[in-house]
């Protein structure tokens, strides 16, 4: 499972931006977020109940300090990150470009973790960043960069980076953490939806988007992310985010026919090389944040 987890995570997570773009044709941002969070919460509560019934000894109640940390991570990942992520795509910015912005996470994570980074690792991180810059430059003639979209994308980047780093310091079972975070996020997002007056057109297409984002991404991919972060550390996992733009561009092209320039493909290839070699030189143990 540990070897398969990164590939499953990349496939599910990278499809998210395109599925959000698809679903937002039938729903407002906050209605989509609220519905997604509600379905995810129900799934996680059911999974937690089944798991705790079969293996009660493996799930222990968190301390007050641990619970506060879990809820802070939930606010960052389930509320802030997803809200900014959806808002960025709603501005019309390409899903591929949103994921390119999020691809900067591996550069931020080692510094937030106060981690020793070797010259070789730093060179590979900078190589990955160069690949992202090349890809964005290649896409600038194809897709107009919406200013608000970029701002929301950067806000999403910092939200998921801080959330992932803090998640690495949580020792509670990943299923318990995910359930608590979802229980926190759902009433917040539903409350915002009521205040702004969102709407949904219930079509088969929207239901497919909702199920994929609720079950596939928000439950499946999030549990995989938490599992990998706990096993490998935040810095090692964050480098996977370099690969997400490549797959996101592919999904965007397959579903919406979005064109990809040769320069963007070259940038993607550079990013892929950086990932392959970085994974061969694992980082030193992360110094946990918020001890």
Q: Which stretches of residues belong to each language-model region?
A:
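Specific alpha-helical transmembrane segments that line the substrate/conduction pathway
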Residues: 31-42, 82-119, 156, 234-253
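Specific transmembrane alpha-helical segments of multi-pass solute transporters/efflux pumps
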Residues: 16-17, 45-98, 134, 214-232
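Glycine-/small-residue-enriched transmembrane alpha-helix faces in small-molecule transporters
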Residues: 1-35, 84, 142-169, 188, ...
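Hydrophobic transmembrane alpha-helices of multi-pass small-molecule transport proteins
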Residues: 44, 103-104, 120-139, 156, ...
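Juxtamembrane helix-entry segments on the extracytoplasmic side of multipass membrane proteins
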Residues: 1-3, 25-34, 60-67, 137-159, ...
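Hydrophobic/small/kink-forming positions within alpha-helical transmembrane segments
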Residues: 14, 18, 45, 75-79, ...
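Helix-helix packing/entry segments at the starts of transmembrane helices
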Residues: 8-10, 35, 97-104, 166-186, ...
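Transmembrane alpha-helices of multi-pass small-molecule transport proteins
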Residues: 26-80, 105-109, 158-163, 179-196, ...
């Amino acid at each position: 499972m540990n070897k398969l987890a990164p590939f499953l995570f990349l496939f599910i997570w990278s499809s998210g931006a395109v599925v959000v773009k698809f679903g937002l044709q039938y729903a407002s941002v906050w209605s989509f977020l609220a519905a997604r969070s509600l379905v995810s919460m129900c799934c996680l509560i059911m999974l937690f109940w089944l798991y705790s019934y079969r293996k009660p000894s493996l799930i222990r109640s968190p301390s007050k300090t641990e619970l506060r940390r879990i809820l802070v991570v939930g606010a960052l990942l389930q509320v802030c990150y997803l809200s900014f992520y959806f808002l960025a795509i709603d501005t019309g910015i390409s899903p591929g470009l949103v994921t390119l912005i999020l691809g900067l996470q591996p550069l931020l994570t080692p510094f937030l973790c106060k981690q020793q980074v070797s010259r070789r690792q730093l060179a590979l991180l900078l190589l990955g960043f160069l690949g992202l810059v090349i890809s964005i430059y290649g896409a600038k003639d194809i897709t107009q960069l919406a200013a608000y979209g970029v701002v929301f994308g950067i806000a999403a980047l910092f939200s998921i980076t801080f959330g992932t780093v803090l998640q690495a310091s949580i020792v509670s079972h990943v299923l318990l953490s995910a359930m608590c975070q979802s229980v926190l996020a759902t009433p917040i997002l539903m409350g915002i939806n009521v205040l702004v007056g969102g709407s949904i057109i219930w079509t088969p297409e929207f239901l497919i988007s909702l199920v994929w984002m609720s079950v596939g991404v928000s439950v499946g991919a999030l549990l995989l992310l938490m599992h990998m972060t706990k096993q490998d550390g935040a810095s090692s996992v964050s480098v996977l985010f370099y690969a997400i733009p490549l797959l996101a561009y592919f999904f965007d092209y397959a579903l919406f026919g979005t064109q990809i320039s040769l320069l963007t493909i070259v940038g993607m290839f550079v990013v892929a090389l950086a990932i392959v070699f970085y994974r061969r030189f694992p980082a030193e143990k992360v110094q946990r944040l918020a001890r």
